A protein has these predicted regions:
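Cytosolic regulatory regions of ion transport systems
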Residues: 1-194
Length: 194
């Protein structure tokens, strides 16, 4: 969908067939086989993502082989911190925790009716879509002075599913709007009483 060439690899033919319409190329094969990976030319790939679930040994072997064969960037999936340590020691450039990240997102997203969406950034920062507190209605962004009081930036206002990023200190906050804010998670919690 983003215009990149994507190759999917799996040892299970049914899983390969299930993703055919989403990828440029799909191969049935054993990712722990050096011969198989070499035949695909993994050294020419910009990014290799290892998402093997349920068999950490295969994930570790695949990660290590990809790096040995010259893969530029290897991103591997882990379920626990100890797995991440092994993956990083054996060739992974980055490790993702899809289940853990989704659980955290859901916990934050559904912890308050005022949080409409949440994107975690580094160093305890986040972008959140939040409802506008009732006491801010019909006031301007300059009047509430959120940047000075809480060190939070308003990135955009959202109404009827459309983002308005052309906001100024004179922009008035209205009912049925939400706002996209950027700041430290703790500051956002404090400001919006989450």
């Amino acid at each position: 969908e983003l215009g990149h060439q994507v190759m999917a690899i799996d040892s299970n033919e049914d899983r390969v067939n299930a993703v055919l319409s989403y990828v440029t190329n799909a191969q049935i094969g054993d990712s722990t086989s050096e011969y198989f990976l070499r035949s695909l030319g993994v050294a020419n790939f910009d990014v290799c993502i290892v998402t093997i679930g349920g068999n950490f040994q295969s994930s570790l072997e695949t990660t290590s082989l990809l790096k040995e064969l010259g893969a530029k960037l290897v991103v591997s999936r882990a379920e626990r911190d100890v797995q991440a340590k092994f993956l990083l020691r054996n060739g992974a450039d980055e490790v993702v925790y899809p289940e853990k990240q989704l659980a955290k997102w859901a916990a934050i997203r559904y912890s308050s009716e005022h949080i409409l969406d949440y994107i975690e950034l580094q160093d305890d920062h986040a972008i959140m879509e939040v409802t506008i507190p009732p006491e801010w209605m019909d006031r301007t962004i300059g009047e509430i002075n959120i940047r000075k009081k809480y060190n939070i930036n308003i990135l955009a206002l959202k109404k009827d599913g459309k983002l308005d990023m052309s906001i100024t200190p004179d922009t008035q906050l209205c009912r049925d709007e939400s706002m996209l804010v950027l700041g430290k998670y703790a500051s956002i919690q404090k400001c919006f009483r989450l």
